[in-house]
């Protein structure tokens, strides 16, 4: 599988969308991140301690119900792009490396 791009979502309720190309040539697009809510990349621009606390709270809340091992799932994309590293660029690079995309 190959990550084609991550860009602003065309869904008015979501922040971003990721499009993947499967080995058979078909594409899959996943919209993720609730628009209007803050994430780690936003919190990290301000108080670093608050950002760490918000990240810990997010992870504790979402660990139960989210699929963080399927890179095409909204849960994995939110976890590894929005709640991983302080910048989206760094998180996307880590996401690609983590899932060999």
Per-region residue spans from a language model:
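Arg/Lys-rich, low-complexity, intrinsically disordered basic segments
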Residues: 1-101
């Amino acid at each position: 599988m190959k990550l084609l791009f991550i860009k602003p979502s065309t869904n008015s309720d979501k922040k971003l969308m990721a499009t993947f190309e499967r080995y058979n040539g078909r594409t899959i697009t996943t919209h993720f991140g609730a628009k209007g809510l803050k994430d780690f990349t936003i919190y990290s621009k301000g108080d670093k301690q608050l950002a760490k606390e918000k990240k810990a709270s997010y992870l504790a809340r979402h660990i139960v119900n989210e699929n963080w091992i399927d890179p095409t799932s909204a849960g994995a994309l939110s976890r590894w792009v929005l709640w991983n590293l302080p910048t989206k660029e760094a998180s996307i690079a880590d996401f690609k490396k983590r899932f060999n995309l």
